[in-house]
């Protein structure tokens, strides 16, 4: 009888422990939840801390605050970072450009566009890159104007990169004109802008538009053009995948430049595996 009683008591103890474990799993403690993710109040506190740092007299501290706000990837943090767009320091204004991106394109694009006319080259360049990261077609007109009119090659290159990041077909004509003017004019002033030309060629490939093939083939086929640009054109043609590019790519595959030859062969395999 005693043995039966002990067995029954053991059985009840097991049931009790099992029920307790299930309760803990179904209802985790507040401390356990706090380990999983920061509380709302902690996030708000951190945003407020960085907001206060934006009032510092030290430009480096203000820039660091913007970097931290941007790294939070929250709209509330990016909204606080908006004030940095009008900071007296170019370094801070440039840092604010990417810090506001968590607002989404509807808010960030209108906020960034004025910075593309900033007197400081670095600010214009960073705002162009940031506009590209919005992936918004609403930024194309501004970026196109920047590509065509800015006096600094670094800014124009950033605009071309940004147009590629957006990847909208509406930018093909402008990008093609940038590339073909250099491809058809030989030793022209534009040929010196190697980063602009490379960025334009790559951006054309990112649009995936067959309308870009003519300009890219012209660049690839022009032996007077800088090899880096021709290689980028070869790669872009592979990204588009139009068989119309195969003759030019096959010619480039026999180039004495091993890197151009390799890029052309890779694109040929992509188009005609």
Per-range role (PLM):
Residues 26-79, 91:
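N-terminal leader/linker segments that initiate helical-solenoid repeat arrays
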Residues 17-28:
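C-terminal segment of classical bacterial N-terminal signal peptides
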Residues 2-15:
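Bacterial N-terminal signal peptides that target proteins for export
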Residues 40-53, 74-86, 105-117, 136-148, ...:
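Amphipathic alpha-helical scaffolding segments comprising HEAT/armadillo-like alpha-solenoid repeats
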Residues 57-58, 88-89, 119-120, 151-152, ...:
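Short inter-helical turns and helix N-cap capping residues of alpha-solenoid HEAT/ARM repeat scaffolds
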